[in-house]
Amino acid sequence: MTDTRIVVQRFVDHFLAGRIIEGLSILNEDGVYTIIGTTPASGVYRGRQDLFDRLLPSLQTFAAPPVFTVSEIIVEKDRAVVLASSNGEGPYGPYIQPHYAFVTRVAGDGFAEVIEFNDTVAVEKALYGRQFVKA
């Protein structure tokens, strides 16, 4: 069994190097990846292939892919939390994520589970062109 910190560091290294697809590939074949919120990208992805089939089209729209900064990695047994931020350019404008949290559970050489917390308004505006007005 691979050490949790090693798996998480591999994920972080890929994201920091701009290799987001390779980072997401660490999800086990039968792993579950959840993106919080109600954006078109939000939801539960069951398995690596489902994640790629449904999320990759949105990721491929970036004019400038997000550049990540990791502020902290917290590891406890098979669980880890990665705190990060990113800046990029979506098809509709700047993509600024001041706070990400990736809550993970490692099994074997990959992730059995990832829950991604992010600023959903940033996703809606930069990736889908949605503007928000007061009700």
Could you tell me what each predicted segment is?
Residues 21, 28-77:
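A solvent-exposed, acidic/Ser-Thr-rich amphipathic alpha-helical stretch
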Residues 11, 22-27, 31, 47, ...:
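Hydrophobic pocket/interface hotspot
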Residues 3, 56-135:
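A beta-strand edge to alpha-helix "cap/lid" segment located at domain peripheries
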Residues 7-8, 36, 40, 89:
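Residue-level detector of alpha-helix boundaries and kinks
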Residues 1-29, 130-135:
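Short, low-complexity N-terminal intrinsically disordered segments enriched in polar/charged residues
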